[in-house]
A protein has these predicted regions:
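Alpha-helical scaffold/interaction cores of sigma-54-like transcription cofactors
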Residues: 1-529
Length: 529
């Protein structure tokens, strides 16, 4: 059997270049008998945390790397993981020299080009462009080409015409060959001792961390739990006693028991700091005489939020349940779930609020976060039809309008093993698509466009673009570029390059600051009155 190890896999976080999905990549590696697998996305670590978690589920050793075109870098250990994060955030020559000297990164390049001198025994000269994996199974090659065409803003027919005319075409190799899939070990000829050496040099380490809340500066003599309790006492007097809400012994006991229960849960989860940070931000907004939202979503079910002035809704008065907001049953020894309180502020003052947070916790410790635009349902079908030039524009619109918005069927999708809007439509509203595609009880597709619907189903969930989350702000106790890969938005402001779920896995704490136009309009009306 071959000693090949797939170390240069490109996931769909290599936007519109790679197509590997981490869950399928890890499960296929397990099925094929691989003991290790590596990813090296294009100047990105955005998919690394999810890849690591998927490999662990499948008993595969995860090897995390990054592709800088002329060379690959792999993390040898946890220190190397943080060195790689630092370098991806700031890929300068000085940083490369410094991190090479640390000895925790492995460099792979086709030519020496000075890398051997920098990395010494941690450098391997190897053609890293060979045996790249851009999609997991051979039948995904068409989907990969769809994503390439999407990035190139062209169609399959136009690319094939250019190739047949002998013209130069970007990504030409992927249109001429379907050999960029994950091979079985026995199908790869050659000696891959270098790949095995790299794999053996890379240790296994954890990327998941417990929540790393920034330290809230309490008044002298107070710890966070004590200060939260003190603020609850003040809120009790201000919001309950002054309004006669606890004018009977029964009511006093009801409110008292609720506060004690909520504090007990919050103390156990070590989340006092979270509430102190949120109330401090809301207090800043109110000191500026800006409107703050009265409380939206499940946060209105927390009495402590009401006592602290974070929300203006009394959960007991409206029979709102604390466990809808925070359920300690979701916590495990290895994972503490985080609360989610939306802080609504006038849209034009959102940047001022974020500037206040940066001033308080440090410019380098605060950033907004990335979000990925994924092809779902209608968008996936439309992309496939457009790039294949399969139907007229009007028919394409008729097809996509027959597929429901994700929001309308979100509850039903949660019950599906494979959350596919297209499959849900074919199964639950078959009349909508019967002229183009039909799905039988076994899940097989038929109809004039069935092969294109198969492509669209495979493409669902694929990253197409990246942007900035409209609300999420990360506040860290560390310099973010040292613990989280960073990118920038169009204005050059720092953006954390892990998505929301991966940031939480890594222990980063998200605070939602939403700019609400309606609050701006209300302020305008009040000020003009």
């Amino acid at each position: 059997m071959s000693n090949f190890i797939p170390l240069n896999c490109k996931t769909h976080y290599s936007l519109q270049k790679g197509f590997c999905k981490n869950n399928l990549l890890a499960s296929k590696c397990s099925e094929y008998g691989y003991k290790a697998c590596g990813i090296a996305d294009l100047e990105s670590l955005s998919g690394a945390v999810d890849f690591h978690q998927q490999c662990k589920k499948n008993d595969i050793k995860p090897i995390i790397g990054c592709d800088f075109d002329d060379y690959l870098l792999f993390a040898k250990n946890k220190k190397g993981w943080f060195d790689l994060i630092n370098y991806v955030s700031e890929p300068t020559l000085d940083n490369l020299k410094n991190f090479a000297a640390n000895g925790n990164l492995i460099c792979v390049s086709n030519k020496s080009n000075g890398f051997k001198k920098l990395f010494k025994k941690n450098h391997f000269q190897y053609d890293h462009k060979k045996h790249q994996v851009y999609y997991v199974t051979e039948d995904e090659s068409d989907c990969h080409r769809i994503m390439l065409c999407s990035g190139m803003k062209t169609t399959i027919k136009k690319v094939n015409k250019l190739i047949s005319d002998g013209k130069e075409v970007k990504n030409k190799e992927f249109f001429e060959s379907s050999n960029f899939f994950l091979p079985k070990p026995e199908d790869v000829a050659g000696d891959f001792e270098i790949l095995n050496q790299i794999s053996e040099m890379c240790e296994e380490y954890e990327v998941a961390e417990k929540p790393m809340l920034p330290t809230f500066e309490c008044p002298e003599g107070f710890e966070e739990d004590d200060y939260l309790t003190e603020l609850c006492r003040k809120g009790w007097k201000k919001r309950l006693m002054s309004s006669n809400k606890i004018d009977t012994e029964e009511k006093k006991n009801e409110y008292g028991d609720r506060v004690k229960h909520e504090l007990k849960v919050i103390f156990k989860a070590e989340l006092s700091g979270y509430f102190l940070i949120v109330q401090d931000i809301i207090n800043f907004v109110k000191r500026k005489d800006w409107l703050a939202g009265p409380g939206r979503g499940s946060a209105a079910g927390c009495l402590i939020s009401y006592l602290l002035g974070i929300t203006d809704v009394d959960p007991i008065e409206y029979d709102l349940i604390f466990e809808r907001f925070y359920n300690e049953g979701r916590n495990t020894e290895d994972h503490i779930s985080l609360p989610d309180i939306d802080m609504d502020v006038p849209a034009e003052y959102r940047d001022d609020v974020i500037d206040y947070i940066k001033e308080k916790y440090g410019e380098e410790n605060v950033a907004q976060m990335i979000t990925f635009g994924r092809l779902q349902g209608r968008a996936a079908v439309k992309e496939v039809l457009r790039i294949n030039e399969a139907v007229s524009f009007s028919e394409m619109n008729a097809i996509t309008e027959s597929i429901p918005d994700e929001a309308r069927i979100s509850d039903q999708l949660e019950l599906m093993d494979e959350k596919s809007i297209i499959k849900w439509t074919l199964e639950n509203e078959p009349e909508n698509l019967k002229n183009w595609c039909i799905m039988n009880e076994k899940g097989d597709l038929s109809g004039p466009l069935s092969h294109l619907f198969e492509q669209a189903i495979k493409i669902e969930g694929t990253n197409k673009s990246q942007g900035k989350h409209p609300a999420g702000v990360i506040i860290s106790k560390h310099r973010l570029a040292a613990v989280c890969p960073m990118t920038t938005d169009k204005s050059g402001d720092p953006v954390a390059a892990f998505d929301m779920g991966d940031l939480e896995t890594q222990g980063h704490v998200k605070f939602d600051v939403l700019g609400i136009d309606l609050l701006s309009k209300i302020m305008e009306i009040v000020n003009d009155a």
